[in-house]
């Protein structure tokens, strides 16, 4: 949809681009619901435990005999849930935008950007390895930049999209360094293998990550902390929250998409994806997640009390709710998908997406 509308939209689909994009997303939503239903009620559970399934995996870049970058799809409880959240909220935004953006000169371009954003988020939530998630992470950043700055003739919108892009890029540098540290010690980019290696004290990867240290902190803790910084930037956690209120300069449906279902919960999703490593191998990093979440929730709530613009109140409300999700992850003892804090965080992510998008 993004490619079709982005390349040919203004020439061939000026009046029908919204209907085409919405129809395509309706199909995507139906497929996401079908996949989630099948996973949760048919084939996902073995002996009472939900499995991490990898239905698709192929080698993308082969550097040498043992060094390659794979691309794949992972299906587990959080990715199945996020498939439904992203497609459903995006579908609602597409439908609402049919009337809201009617008559806009760049109507096809708007839907092309929405399509790119949705594609990027779907790719992010089903990524089977940590480098693949980084690629889609950056695509989410680019598409949010395009959407926030959609009204490019408004100086405030231009300033807001640049601010969001630059602040999240700073955080993403930390994310990339964290990826390099974790993959160097685990010897893999694949999530399942990386988690197994870095949560098993007898493996060579765990021993090297725990032994190597910088200013008294292990390489494993540094790697996880840097990955969390990337997540904190995307999820507007203190002190990287400064871009979020200004992000309301985009069209109102875009604000619903960014502040509800997609971009701001990407950081929570990232911490949840690596949660076993945080909980088992580096409680200190998990404690940092909890503190940052709690501070962000409190500060955002206090700032929201002083705002007079309803859209900025919603922005700080979102920051506060994301803080609660991070806090729940930070205080959760490890129990797999049965950990109470983990479960509460994912449940709140789902419910917040629905009520905030309204």
Model-derived regions: residue spans:
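N-terminal low-complexity, Ser/Thr- and acidic-residue-enriched intrinsically disordered segments
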Residues: 1-6
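Transmembrane helix-loop-helix hairpins at membrane boundaries of multipass inner-membrane proteins
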Residues: 8-84, 88-112, 185-214, 273-275, ...
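Hydrophobic transmembrane alpha-helices and their helix-loop junctions in integral membrane proteins
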Residues: 92-133, 142-358
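Short phosphate-coordinating micro-motif centered on Lys-Gly-acidic
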Residues: 138
């Amino acid at each position: 949809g993004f490619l079709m509308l982005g390349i040919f939209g203004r020439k061939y689909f000026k009046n029908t681009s919204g209907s085409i994009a919405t129809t395509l997303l309706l199909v995507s939503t139906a497929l996401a619901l079908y996949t989630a239903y099948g996973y949760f009620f048919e084939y996902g559970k073995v002996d009472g435990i939900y499995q991490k399934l990898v239905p698709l995996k192929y080698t993308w870049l082969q550097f040498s005999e043992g060094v390659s970058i794979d691309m794949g799809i992972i299906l587990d409880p959080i990715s199945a849930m996020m498939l439904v959240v992203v497609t459903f909220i995006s579908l609602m935004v597409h439908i609402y935008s049919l009337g809201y953006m009617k008559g806009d000169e760049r109507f096809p371009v708007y839907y092309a950007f929405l399509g790119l954003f949705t594609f990027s988020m779907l790719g992010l939530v089903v990524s089977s390895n940590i480098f693949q998630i980084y690629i889609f992470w950056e695509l989410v950043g680019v598409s949010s930049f395009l959407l926030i700055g959609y009204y490019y003739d408004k100086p405030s919108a231009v300033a807001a999209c640049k601010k969001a892009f630059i602040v999240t890029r700073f955080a993403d540098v930390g994310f990339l360094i964290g990826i390099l540290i974790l993959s160097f010690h685990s010897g893999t980019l694949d999530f399942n293998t990386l988690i197994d290696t870095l949560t098993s004290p007898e493996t060579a990867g765990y021993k090297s990550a725990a032994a190597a240290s910088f200013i008294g902190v292990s390489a494993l803790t540094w790697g996880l902390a840097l990955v969390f910084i990337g997540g904190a930037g995307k999820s507007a956690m203190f002190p990287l929250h400064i871009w979020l209120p200004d992000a309301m300069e985009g069209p109102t449906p875009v604000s619903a998409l960014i502040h509800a279902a997609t971009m701001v919960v990407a950081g929570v999703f990232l911490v949840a994806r690596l949660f076993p490593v945080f909980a088992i191998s580096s409680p200190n990093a998990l404690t940092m997640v909890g503190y940052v979440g709690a501070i962000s929730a409190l500060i955002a709530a206090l700032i929201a009390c002083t705002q007079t613009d309803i859209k900025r109140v919603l922005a700080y409300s979102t920051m506060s709710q994301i803080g609660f999700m991070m806090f729940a992850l930070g205080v959760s003892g490890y129990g797999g998908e049965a950990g109470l804090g983990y479960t509460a965080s994912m449940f709140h992510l789902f419910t917040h997406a629905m009520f905030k998008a309204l």
